[in-house]
Amino acid sequence: MENTQENPATPSAEDIGSEKQAAQGAAPAAEAADAALAEAQAKVAELQESFLRAKAETENVRRRAQDDVSKAHKFAIESFAEHLLPVLDSLEAAVSDTSGDIAKVREGVELTLRQLTSALEKGRVVAINPVGEKFDPHQHQAISMVPAEQEPNTVVTVLQKGYMIADRVLRPALVTVAQSK
């Protein structure tokens, strides 16, 4: 009996030809895939480098901003202190005065008070002196209520001035307020 079936393990000539053709067709595809992979890897490396540079730049900007804020806090009072130095000079001159002339001392104290008021205003510190104004619990602290001719809840007297810097109350004014009739 003769074996007419071909051995499946032995490839035929057609199979060998088609495998060579497939291998030859696969070679350009593999080369194209390798080129695409290399291009993608180069792009990834480029993007990683760009990311690291952007991250470093962001860190530098953040650090510079922190330094600027730190310097602003550190030297914010410098201008205010410069405006107070003439007041200090005037007070030292008053203390060292031995003339005993009360009128001269009073005049010096008034001048010093004007210098101090000017220095505070240059630092945007303004007095709250609300006589005759409506009572405002954000700016005033009522010490007492008194019978008065003014409209109820109106400031009658200021016992101690308050002070504001910009729109913030540093110290509320101590006031007496008109009582309801």
Curated annotation (Swiss-Prot):
Coiled coil: none annotated. GO terms for cellular component: cytosol. The keyword tRNA processing does not apply. Keywords: Chaperone, Cytoplasm, Stress response. InterPro entries: GrpE, GrpE_coiled_coil, GrpE_head. Signal peptide: none annotated. It comes from the Bacteria. Residues 1-10 have a biased composition (Polar residues). GO terms for molecular function: adenyl-nucleotide exchange factor activity; protein homodimerization activity; protein-folding chaperone binding; unfolded protein binding. Belongs to the GrpE family. Homodimer. Participates actively in the response to hyperosmotic and heat shock by preventing the aggregation of stress-denatured proteins, in association with DnaK and GrpE. It is the nucleotide exchange factor for DnaK and may function as a thermosensor. Unfolded proteins bind initially to DnaJ; upon interaction with the DnaJ-bound protein, DnaK hydrolyzes its bound ATP, resulting in the formation of a stable complex. GrpE releases ADP from DnaK; ATP binding to DnaK triggers the release of the substrate protein, thus completing the reaction cycle. HAMAP family: GrpE (MF_01151). This is Protein GrpE. It comes from Burkholderia cenocepacia (strain ATCC BAA-245 / DSM 16553 / LMG 16656 / NCTC 13227 / J2315 / CF5610) (Burkholderia cepacia (strain J2315)).
